[in-house]
């Protein structure tokens, strides 16, 4: 019998998790990925013994990846953090003493209040890794109530460029609609059968393919889907904006765009048409490495196959040209009539939930947008979090003002932020650093206080997809956490009581879940029984109310470009880096299906599948440098070097090196930060040049060279 009842005050503790009981719980995956997969989890005596996919799952329909099967291993790992720790030696030396939760909370609050008194509230920042539930919004609330405008998260290289550019261009974030049939799906830098930041839509895509939908894959690597595609476009890493502009050139020049939609619902089409004339397939073939006839074939397929969905991936947001890449692709969706159409790219509608602005208490910090660190660097409005490059400048140089303290939850920033050496320098300069984690990481090892977090299956949770997808998922508790491991939501709630006025917080952190759900008319128990909430499906909304832009139309020509100091039309202003004969190869990276960013290298079941950091190199290139499969190799850029293991494969272009990201070694010594430098991709990246709109660094398309390690 399935149990969907959450462990709440109505049904908690021993009543819910009695010994000598076996129970199945319907829940959703979390913290191994974004968490879209519905799961059936079996627990015995407060221990998870079986996990499988739920065939009734809205997104995954029974499919789950290896990470889901291994997710319970985190809960019982012998190296898990189980008590608050305080540093008793030099920062990063790996010497700790156990402290109580009350002492840890008091120490953090005392130090942050002292920094606030000496430097102002904005000199304390609050940081989040990849958001997975309401804990990010609780953290934003904590910052606002405390008086700091600064929350740091990886939005500048993940989601925000697509979301914010969409809002400015067409009034919403256009996501691929896999719930309705498409004639064609374009996977642009999106490897949904292996890794997928959008939530698990792999099964929905495979279902469409089985029903005859064709696909185009735009990717530097020959992915599994590239081998099945109608067309695989193997572009040079970091040249997405050039290829998208060439598509626009073909479609407009040949007159195969949606003339009725363009005439009535776009602003600036004549200007765009004139602007893209120079971006011919012949001219764009050189920077993209794509033959002109392939460019034409791809453009024609997309324009003449309606509806077409463009599923775009994270790589688009990882160069200094992300604004132009994303703008060009939204223009492409618009001129081909695929915006707000079933089976095209659509706007999700949220279910009835507590308004975000009210929950995070934006009213307490009305000047926030002007006071955030990146506002002083001229980024485009609507960025909710601070780009990491600008954060570190504040920590190291005091620009635009000093940052002296930080609280981080669920982020291994030392590995995640570009140009890792600067992250180490920045954290070493802090007066105080506190970290919430489930396992000691290189970042946690630098902290003054480390707090042991509960992880998924150990607390009631809401998976929030909000802006992008319009649904929220129930993640009811399955087992009790170790006694001193707290959910991040509880940690933030208790920190809020210590740092600010208690009446601004909740008596119990689970009241936050009830508050979020209240507008829906459901309690958390009722929500868990339903499994998920989805906003209503509405298409072609522009027919009655236009688009939510200043002109009421899709702004191919951005009407507020001068105000935001950005280009009004998408441009090609070169590659991420200019070619350099000293670094003749092009470096890129991709995520592993076995890990989530830098997480879970310590989960043995996953590590067995990928024990070493792998760099893909083409056979011709390997032969030139006398490299064999399995060799240790050194990859170098202008910024630094790292060592990984060579994997010789024709899945990459001879001019491309594809390296693994997020690697550190939990088996190494904590006093040396777990060999964080050895194979760390971000030892090779730079923040010297940043994208104007979002402060995005170049993580792809970087000049490099390789050699065999001695």
Label the predicted regions.
Residues 49, 258-259, 295, 309-310, ...:
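Acidic/polar loop patches that form or flank catalytic/metal-binding clefts of enzymes
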Residues 17, 478, 482-533, 606-616, ...:
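Long, contiguous, secondary-structure-rich segments that constitute the structural scaffold
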Residues 124-132, 268, 286-287, 313-320, ...:
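Conserved short loop/turn motifs at secondary-structure junctions
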Residues 137-207, 211-218, 241-245, 331-445, ...:
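Extended redox/cofactor-interaction regions of prokaryotic respiratory oxidoreductases
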Residues 229-235, 454-464, 470-481:
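Short beta-alpha connecting loops at secondary-structure transitions
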Residues 129-130, 264-267, 302, 345-356, ...:
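A glycine-rich phosphate-binding loop feature that marks nucleotide/adenosyl-phosphate handling sites
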Residues 2-254, 283, 291, 409, ...:
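N-terminal export/assembly segments and adjacent metallocofactor-ligating motifs
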Residues 90-92, 188-190, 228-229, 279-282, ...:
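Flexible glycine/proline-enriched surface loops and loop-helix/loop-strand junctions
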């Amino acid at each position: 019998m399935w149990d969907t009842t959450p462990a709440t005050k109505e049904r908690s503790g021993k009543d819910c998790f009695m010994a000598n009981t076996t129970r199945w719980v319907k829940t959703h995956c979390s913290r191994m990925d974004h968490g879209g997969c519905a799961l059936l989890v079996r627990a015995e005596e407060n221990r998870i013994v079986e996990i499988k996919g739920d065939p009734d799952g809205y997104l995954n329909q029974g499919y789950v990846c290896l990470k889901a099967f291994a997710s319970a291993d985190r809960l019982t790992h012998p190296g898990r953090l189980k008590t608050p720790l305080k540093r008793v030696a030099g920062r990063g030396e790996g010497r700790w003493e156990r402290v109580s939760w009350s002492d840890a909370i008091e120490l953090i609050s005392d130090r942050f209040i002292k920094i606030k008194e000496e430097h102002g509230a904005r000199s304390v920042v609050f940081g989040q890794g990849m958001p997975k539930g309401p804990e990010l919004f609780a953290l934003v609330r904590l910052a606002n109530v405390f008086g700091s405008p600064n929350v740091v998260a990886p939005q500048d290289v993940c989601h925000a460029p697509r979301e914010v550019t969409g809002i400015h261009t067409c009034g919403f974030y256009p996501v691929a609609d896999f719930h309705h049939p498409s004639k064609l799906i374009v996977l642009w830098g999106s490897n949904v059968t292996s890794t997928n930041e959008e939530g698990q839509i792999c099964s929905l895509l495979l279902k469409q393919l089985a029903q005859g939908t064709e696909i185009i894959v735009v990717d530097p690597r020959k992915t599994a889907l590239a081998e099945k595609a109608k067309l695989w476009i193997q572009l040079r890493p970091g040249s997405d904006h050039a290829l998208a502009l060439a598509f626009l050139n073909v479609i407009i020049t040949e007159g195969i765009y949606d003339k009725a939609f363009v005439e009535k619902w776009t602003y600036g089409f004549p200007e765009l048409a004139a602007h893209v004339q120079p971006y011919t397939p012949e001219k764009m073939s050189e920077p993209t490495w794509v033959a002109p006839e392939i460019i034409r074939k791809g453009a024609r397929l997309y324009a003449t196959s309606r509806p077409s969905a463009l599923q775009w991936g994270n790589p688009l947001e990882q160069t200094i040209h992300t604004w132009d890449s994303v703008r060009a692709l939204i223009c492409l969706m618009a001129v081909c009539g695929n915006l707000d159409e079933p089976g095209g790219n659509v706007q999700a509608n949220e279910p009835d939930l507590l308004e975000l602005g009210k929950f995070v208490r934006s009213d307490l910090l009305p000047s926030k947008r002007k006071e955030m660190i990146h506002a002083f660097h001229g980024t485009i409005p609507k960025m909710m979090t601070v780009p990491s490059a600008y954060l570190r400048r504040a920590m190291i140089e005091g620009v635009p003002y000093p940052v002296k303290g930080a609280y981080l939850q669920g982020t291994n920033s030392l590995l995640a932020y570009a140009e890792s050496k600067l992250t180490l320098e920045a954290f070493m300069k802090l007066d105080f650093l506190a970290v919430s984690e489930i396992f000691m990481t290189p970042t946690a090892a630098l902290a003054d206080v480390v707090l042991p977090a509960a992880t998924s299956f150990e607390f009631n949770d809401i998976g929030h997809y909000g802006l992008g997808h319009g649904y929220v998922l129930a993640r009811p508790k399955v087992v009790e956490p170790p006694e001193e491991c707290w959910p991040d939501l509880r940690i933030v709630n208790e920190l809020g009581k210590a740092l600010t006025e208690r009446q601004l917080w909740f008596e119990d952190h689970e009241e936050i879940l009830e508050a979020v759900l209240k507008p829906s008319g459901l309690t958390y128990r009722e929500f868990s029984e339903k499994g998920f909430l989805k906003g209503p499906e509405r298409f072609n909304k522009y027919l009655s109310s236009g688009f939510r832009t200043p002109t009421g139309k899709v702004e191919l020509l951005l009407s507020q470009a001068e105000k935001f100091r950005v280009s009004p039309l998408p441009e090609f202003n070169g590659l991420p880096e200019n070619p350099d004969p000293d670094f003749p190869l092009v470096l890129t990276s991709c995520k592993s299906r076995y890990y989530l960013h830098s997480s879970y290298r310590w989960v043995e079941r996953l590590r067995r599948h990928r024990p070493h950091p792998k760099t893909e190199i083409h056979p011709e290139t390997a032969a030139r440098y006398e490299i064999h499969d399995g060799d240790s190799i050194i990859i170098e850029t202008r910024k630094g070097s790292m060592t990984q293991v060579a994997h010789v494969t024709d899945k990459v272009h001879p001019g491309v090196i594809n390296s693994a990201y997020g690697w550190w070694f939990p088996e190494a010594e904590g006093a040396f930060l777990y060999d964080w430098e050895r194979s760390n991709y971000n030892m090779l990246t730079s923040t010297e040049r940043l994208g104007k709109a979002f402060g995005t660094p170049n993580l792809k398309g970087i000049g490099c060279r390789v050699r065999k390690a001695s």
